[in-house]
Amino acid sequence: MRNKLNKKIIERYSRQIILKDVGIIGQKAINNSKVIIIGVGGLGCPIVDYLSRAGVGTIGIADFDKISLSNIHRQPLYDSRDIGKFKVDIVKKKIKAINSNIKIKSYKKKIATKNFEKIIKNFDIIVDGSDNFKTKFLLNKYSIKYKKILVVGAINKFDGH
């Protein structure tokens, strides 16, 4: 993103710019940040939605799954018309409609040792929205190796962590 905030950008993010701990400098930092979300399901969907609305300048999304009917009630970026389509394709389209100022990089693949190393280098922060321990351990390993910030969340029935 740009280093300058024009009038339209300032208006868009005015509610967070007025916060003492954000301000213009903080908003520029948000606009210039690069975050990747691994998994755009129950956790990743709302995360990518909010990050795009906050103005994160570059968002990566990685998921190899297709949308099913059972996703619709708990994954807010999807609706019935999206069933059978790849999650990353729909997320990219909907996020661009929400905020056309940001860059979206999509990775329609399963995260594995052979491909993740190349992907991770382009981002400052990794957000774990995955639903399996193998991926969680891999994200932890590479976040340490490349000194990346890793944000982890998990859901189990009615518990969130």
Predicted feature residues:
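Adenine nucleotide-associated cytosolic modules
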Residues: M1-H161
